[in-house]
Amino acid sequence: DCVLHNHPYKGASHSPDIAVVMPVFSNEKLIGFSANTAHHVDIGAATPGLIIDVPDMWAEGMLLDAVKLYEGGKRVEPLWKYIKDNTRVPGLVMGDLEAQIASAELGVKRFEELLSKYGKDDVITACNQLMDYTEKMMRAEIEKIPDGDYKAEGFLDDDGRDRSKTLPIKVCVKIRGSEVEVDLTGSSEQVPTAFNVPFDGSTKVAAFFVFRAMLLDTYSSNEYIPQNEGSFRPIKVKAPLGSIFNPIAPAAAEARFCQIQRMADLVIKALGPVIPEKSTAGNAATLSFAAYSGVRPSGDYWVFLEVNE
């Protein structure tokens, strides 16, 4: 089987990021998954490329809620046709999906090779040990930070529609022993455009990322720390339901770039006074896109995205 998923209220980072997930079996028992995510240039939203000023998540384009593109090794042709018919650039999107599938298939193959070489029990044990090890290292770094509540505030220029209203962002980093909570209470309420952030797929992930980058950076650490779920375990994230970082469906949540960068920047700012050696200066905390599109003389649509950081 091959599953597609991009639903912003069910774990996806935002709707253009489509995940391809394939199961891995051992003796007909499910033991894991091979998965990847890719940003797709156009998924049939209200405007070509990327969007901001739209009323709800349905205007973001195709919402794929863990649907099967392959089942039992066979293509689910109606879904392939649906995707092809609902993007402005089917050649690009279908080609990228095929590449994702090939990547996931390679992951399944490599996983199966490990199982064949070492046996299921040893592979699963090793995976768990690696996650436990990374968790242990993350907790050890958190424990070096004095207990306390560390706060920082910032803002976003606007929601893409009402240019007269800035959006407050407030961060409180609560350190308690080997655990940390990032509390976003006081940040802007959700907005009526796509300038909201999927909580599970982006808000929480931004918090996981910033602590990994600050405390277990690959280049500054003295030893190799595996990248895995273990580093997430000591970190909790709190954002009031109905806020920009935890919107209520069906609010649009496609344009979530600047918000999570501002949030990460404020976490660093909050902790700067107590761990200055691991903190960076403030950054632009923004990401801008320019989307170009049109119709060729042949009648084919074209879409091009330029990313500026």
Q: Residues of each region from the PLM?
A:
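Glycine/proline-enriched, intrinsically flexible loops and inter-domain linkers
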Residues: 1-181, 185-309
